[in-house]
């Protein structure tokens, strides 16, 4: 554990009145070396480019991706009109255009609640929606989609999750990562062949989905369950990620998956007394540092419990 957060002070405000902003760190500041946890130098400047007010989107939660045209593309979780979120395009100067509003089709057949975007090898943007889409399985009125969108805003739904009996292909997908082979890799929070604890999958740009692993395949779910974000492909070619729940100690896991689909649990959280090593890994993919190690956060545990 590198740092243990502790909550101090009083939190105020309501979720319903949150206004999110896209911020830009000046290019000159991005090139500065890491400060090893110290205060950022005065040369680092932040500039607010867009204030989301509900009419242009609300609660953007995923990173932006830069297209070949130099524009920045992103998603907003939901919008004021009650729709299922949107995809937007923004110039580096801050001029924002909404490209697509989800739930534009009856019963949200085009998907709802988008995750982050990924730039494919063909220059198109790909992504997933957490819910919505067309499902033929009872009990799942739309378990998410995999889509492609052009830079002009033409959206094509490529795959509808829960297309197989009992949702063995997964349900409620998270974000994606582009693999070295040109395919996309991701996780789902539900579905799978072992009780609905989520999956790791590979999907081609054309929509051929292969389930690589279904969580809770081991007794007492010691392999983890319910991943909340995409894995990353490390320099060794394997996929690494986290699960929010289960594991040998019940606090979630860190896993490695080979391209052949062999999963190894690298760490089970809450292994130390009072979960001082952390518990319940936070939403957000791991980061591999230049030293080859992986970095991430948990939303529970630690040596400094909240007062």
What residues fall within each predicted segment?
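Extracellular beta-propeller repeat domains
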Residues: 2-307
